[in-house]
């Protein structure tokens, strides 16, 4: 049995376990996938930044007469500060991941191992859920601000601050676009993660086939000797 194991490792040590010298050559399909991920990562950065800027700078002033003025800014609705914070975190994270993906176009295995793949997978999943939750809660608050809610004596805020509501709404739309991009990015991170385990299973399958073929050859030689 030890002889078979030695044969297996001697056969696999060449083209299978030891990559060729030109290890940075990326297959065409894999390269297209990485380019798509780079585009999506930087798209998330743009959408998240636009959302944070639009919501964070939303403000308005209404003159009620008699020297009375009321002001509105993004802290008026409690969900907006949360959205701005999530947008900022998502933009920074996506920028770092976008740079990593861009470098991976030229260096095949840069910054990619199982530990990092699991970390990226968990972060992508968590941020996708968080940005979607933040955008959804903002959308609900925006609807109440537009339509009002008599049960809670919530007035139609947008009736007084049209520009404020317009900028907040634009920021909310960009947040949803960022969330949509994160859904696709999360799918890609799942693919990258489990592909690492798939390669390991492929090596094991090849080793098993080599062992079987060697055992069959030895039996044939024994029968021929008899």
UniProtKB/Swiss-Prot annotation:
Residue ranges annotated as Cytoplasmic topological domain: 1-37, 100-114, 192-226
Coiled coil: none
Cellular localization per UniProt: Cell membrane
Domain of life of the native organism: Eukaryota
Membrane topology listed for this record: Multi-pass membrane protein
One Pfam family this sequence matches: CASP_dom
Entry-linked InterPro entries: CASP/CASPL, CASP_dom
GO cellular component assignments: plasma membrane
Entry keyword set: Cell membrane, Membrane, Transmembrane, Transmembrane helix
Extracellular face of the membrane: 59-78, 136-170
Membrane-traversing stretches: 38-58, 79-99, 115-135, 171-191
UniProt similarity note: Belongs to the Casparian strip membrane proteins (CASP) family.
Subunit structure as annotated in this protein's UniProt entry: Homodimer and heterodimers.
Name listed for the protein in its UniProt record: CASP-like protein 2BC1
Organism field: Picea sitchensis
